[in-house]
Amino acid sequence: MFQMAKRVLLSTTLTFSLLAGSALPFLPASAIYADADTAVTNKQNFSTDVIYQVFTDRFLDGNPSNNPTGAAFDGTCSNLKLYCGGDWQGLVNKINDNYFSDLGVTALWISQPVENIFATINYSGVTNTAYHGYWARDFKKTNPYFGTMTDFQNLVTTAHAKGIKIIIDFAPNHTSPAMETDTSFAENGKLYDNGNLVGGYTNDTNGYFHHNGGSDFSTLENGIYKNLYDLADLNHNNSTIDTYFKDAIKLWLDMGVDGIRVDAVKHMPQGWQKNWMSSIYAHKPVFTFGEWFLGSAAPDADNTDFANESGMSLLDFRFNSAVRNVFRDNTSNMYALDSMLTATAADYNQVNDQVTFIDNHDMDRFKTSAVNNRRLEQALAFTLTSRGVPAIYYGTEQYLTGNGDPDNRGKMPSFSKSTTAFNVISKLAPLRKSNPAIAYGSTQQRWINNDVYIYERKFGKSVAVVAVNRNLTTPTSITNLNTSLPSGTYTDVLGGVLNGNNITSSGGNISSFTLAAGATAVWQYTASETTPTIGHVGPVMGKPGNVVTIDGRGFGSAKGTVYFGTTAVTGSAITSWEDTQIKVTIPPVAGGDYAVKVAANGVNSNAYNDFTILSGDQVSVRFVINNATTALGENIYLTGNVSELGNWTTGAASIGPAFNQVIHAYPTWYYDVSVPAGKQLEFKFFKKNGATITWEGGSNHTFTTPTSGTATVTINWQ
């Protein structure tokens, strides 16, 4: 039986010999992987990718002629608050010399590419610059210290030729530091539109910014409508700002970017962001994920709601916290890691779309002098083989250290390809494209104690099993291990780099073995699928007429049927059909959440649940209600006649709880909502305390939404 299984594996996984450790030359992903779902052209799905987050300024100076001059620049990079010279040409150089390809990286997440302020800012006697990219002034121009538009286009083109996607950081929450009373401070938060001044923070007569002071982060509302530190906070309920950011992101999409990382999503109205995402998906849909900072692995209701309802994924801080606690800080054990995976799978509708990571530019690096290299290598192996889209912070493969800003943003120390961390990444990263169990699979714990975790990823008939022993001094005897691996002998994909061993399976029962101290091993089986099996649908929402990409296995070559709920889509509405990918037009059905299924050769696939169909083009509307007094424990909610307002439900799909502290004060309440454009809405507010509902009286309120821009509708409680 194993000989047959082995033939299937060799015939369906082009990279098998590479994964087993043979010295095949590394080819770009576009050359190795023939499946459509794994191609660099698949901008809607990053499940088969490994992201490499790079601080552009800190990576490599490929063009010294574009470096800043004077006090803003330190070519030695000893002053980490100044520019160090890294640019897009430096990235191009490392793409061309195959550093990223040899590492196994298939997506680069670069610093925000837009023009930042040129002024330096003195904080506590230290000169600060916008090297990080988060002090924008013009979202329609490039940061000249990174390169020109031509340079950026060259970066995208060069990356694509090597099978590498480009993700841009994007920060529509704010412009740059400003002081209300001092127009000479920095650049007064001024916003420009391709060189033309839109407005500054002081004397903001057009209401482009919020002027509510700095946030103390005590509530979600406080963090949204007040300034993030001293950054000039943009008012997304202003039609000019709304249009500006829809136009600005389209400019970068038209340059060919493949993904967007949205900064500070916790600090912008969810309703505006959903309307913005709808405009992106209607233009050129790309994988988008946001930053919602969490300080622990504990569930957060607002974070979960955003991940499930906003139209974008999130950086998975719950995953990050659990991994750091277990592997870096020794403050919890493998049971906590397993619990995190179980809890997040239950909480996040599309858990495989959340972006996993072990460190980034806003926290201490994983590696310190007190953290053994093996713990870093194990954390990398876990992240690369776990659910979600893995992101590796630049320099991790070189064991770069640094606690806090700016030390966690140091200069790339070397480009060695011989470190163990580099080796671990390069061996495991290709699994995401060769074995769909890693890209799309479910997760099941198979063996566990405080220090050892053995888990299985499974998709269809494809399987991967990963064993990690974080105890660096004590081996563990593994008995009674049962998996879905077919009968046969399986070699460690890592080739023993982390002291892993081979195993033998007999009908899924694994012969007893000893997992060495500090060992990590990965065993995998890849099989072809004859049954249609959906792994991913992207984007996660869209309006009728948008094209959606369905990825998976076993769809066959003959065009079948796609179902949105019970609505069948056939014929020309299916724009392409391949064994691993289908592109289909969303049918003209009512807005709401739908299960997507595929029928091929008379066989129905699994259901991919919670795909959101919008009622049409979206606009952001602020709903305000006056004189809504409440008793202790009561909050104000909104519902109405479209799915975006909950279709008259008082349950989880209703809107709220409304806010009443910053833009308006109690007993006036407000909330920003993404609703269909150019449509007459009917709606009502209600009070809710647990299961107790109190509706306002009178007839339904009505409001016709604008066809573009934003609006505010204000009513009195009746």
UniProtKB/Swiss-Prot annotation:
Q: Which residues form the signal peptide?
A: 1-34
> Region entry A2: which residue ranges?
237-440
- Tell me which residues make up the CBM20 domain: 613-718
- Cysteines paired by S-S bonds: 77-84
Main subcellular location of this protein, as a coarse class: secreted
Q: Where does substrate bind?
A: 134-135, 174, 227-230, 261, 266-267, 361, 405, 409
| Sequence segments annotated as region (C) | 441-528
Q: Name its cellular compartments.
A: Secreted
- Which residues does the Swiss-Prot or TrEMBL record annotate as the active site? 263, 291
Q: What class of enzyme is it?
A: transferase
Entry's EC annotation:
2.4.1.19
Q: Which family does it belong to?
A: Belongs to the glycosyl hydrolase 13 family.
Q: Which named protein is this?
A: Cyclomaltodextrin glucanotransferase
